[in-house]
Amino acid sequence: QTLELSNKLVDQGQMVNNGTIHNNNTSNNSHNKTFNLNFFLNETCKDAMNITDFVKSLQLNLQDLERVGELGYVEGISHAFVKGLNDLEVHKRPIHCSDLKREIIHIKDKDKWERDTTNQDKLKRAIKDVSNKNIMLLDDWQKKNPGYDKYNDRKNDIYLKMMVQAMGPADHIAEKRDFGKIIRRIAKNTIIEKE
């Protein structure tokens, strides 16, 4: 009986040792799958556009201007910006968000990737530039919509609402609030998938 008990203990010990070795292999394999942000930005996204080139290439149309008038500044500008980003392949985009909760944004500018400041200065500049491109469409809208300047015309109401919304926030407090909302929407659509 002692010999039989002894053999069982040896067998159980070997099973435990085999299980431990197997667990170590699994553990080691999972460590090899860590995400490297610098590699993603500098290698995978090395051909991404610069933020200024992205804004210049963004093709806004009268529908974008009208959307700002209908939905408001935040929704309209967010839609135009995100639509432009979504039209690009992920590795060609000039903006990536590495942490949605903290809104950590990385922007390619002057051919190098940089983390945007805590105030999101580069992204705010890009948002203002997109907003200005939108405002420039007001003249085209006027030409295609005669009667916009007549008080009793329905087009006048549409034009005035569109113009007010296209101009953006009226003061610094509203600007900070609206830009914060736009940045959150951009961040949600540019979050890096860490697969």
Task: Report the location of each language-model feature.
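Intrinsically disordered, low-complexity regulatory regions of eukaryotic transcription factors
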Residues: 1-22
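Extended amphipathic coiled-coil helices
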Residues: 20, 26-195
